Amino acid sequence: MVGSTKIKVLNRDNGSVVYNIPEMNGLRRTFQAGEIKTVTFEELEKLSYIPGGMTLLRDCLVILDNKEAISELLGHVEPEYSYTRNDIINLMKNGSLEEFLDCLDFAPEGVTDLIKTLSVQLPLNDVAKREAIYQKLGFNVDNAIRIQKEAAEPVQEHAQPERRVQKT
């Protein structure tokens, strides 16, 4: 693949992704959560060589609509690699339990992190899928939802106790 080929890249992570590539005149790239940017194949290739770069490419960033670039940079990837936020929401709401279990087993870490976040935000109503998340990822969706609700409740100030018996 030619280094100047333009490739769309999505940050599927919940937070920002930032990387520096010294070989490209100190290029610093920042992706906000859910942001799509167009970068060159050369940039992604150089990113893969720096420490932590492959982890960013596999878990946080998604190469969109370019199977050749995915193949050259990452080799074989599971179908779950290309799941976007909307794909995950659809799987959680409408997918079968077997599809969901496959996703938990084979998806990159960025997808499983997004599943944890979305299971609380949506919230995930399927008890079997909640149990699967707990078994596969060790994340208790029920407790996370309970804690989130407790944190959202206003803090009640305790009133000063009043004497029941008045001595004069």
Where are these regions (language model features)?
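Charge/polar-rich, low-complexity and marginally structured segments
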Residues: 81-168
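Compact, well-ordered interaction domains used in eukaryotic information-processing assemblies
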Residues: 1-79
